[in-house]
Amino acid sequence: MSHCGKKTTFDAIRYSDAPPCFTHTMCEALYPGHPRAKTDEQLEHIARNGGMIGITALGYFVGSDPGGKTNIETYLDHIDHAVRLVGVDHVGLSSDFQVQGIRPWATKENWYEPRLKSFKPSYNVKWPPWIPELDSTDRFLNVTYGLFKRGYSDSAIRKILGLNWMRYFEQIIGL
C-alpha cells in the first residue's frame, strides 16, 4: 500500500482480513505535498488495525534536499512523528534500496536520469538521492545512535530496528 493513493489505502485497510502495512513510506505532516507521503489519518488507521509503518530512508522521500539539508536527523524526525502518533509498536525501518546503499553502484546516467523521465515531478527526484549516514551498512548503527540520542529506550530501539517487523511477519505468515 506504500504506492497507493488515499482512497485505495482506506479501502485496503477496511477490507483486509490481515493487519495492513506501509512497507516504505514517510509522514506527510513533515513533507507535505509529496505523493508518496502518508497522512496522519492513514498512519493511524494502519496502527488501529494492527499494522506496520516502515519509514523509508530514501533522501528525496523524507526531505527536499538529500545530501544537503535533508540528513539523518530529517529521517529520525519521520520516525519520531510516527512513534508519537501511533506508538512504538507500529513503526519500523525501511530503506527502499539494497543493503550496500545506492552510492557504490549508482551514477547519474543509470539511476538519476531514468527516474527523471519516469517519476512525476512531484516526486522531487534529486541527485544524489541518498542521505550519507543512511547509505551504507552502517545505517543501522547510525539510526540506533540517533534514536538513543533522542531518548529512546533500548526496548523501543530494538522494536524499531526489527522486532516490530518480526512480530508483524509472524502474525501475517505464522512463522
Region spans (language model):
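Histidine/acidic residue-rich metal-binding segments in metalloenzymes
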Residues: M1-C21, H34-G51, E73-D89
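Conserved, mostly hydrophobic/aromatic
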Residues: H24, I53, D96, I157
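Glycine-rich tight-turn/loop motif centered on a GG-T
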Residues: T25-T39, I53, G67-K69
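A conserved active-site cap/scaffold subdomain adjacent to cofactor or substrate pockets
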Residues: A47-I72
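Short glycine/threonine-rich loop-to-helix capping motif typified by GTGT followed
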Residues: G67-G68, I102-K108, F169-L175
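Short acidic/histidine-rich active-site segments
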Residues: V86-W111, R115-F119, Y123-E133
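Mid-to-C-terminal alpha-helical segments outside catalytic/metal-binding sites
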Residues: V125-L175
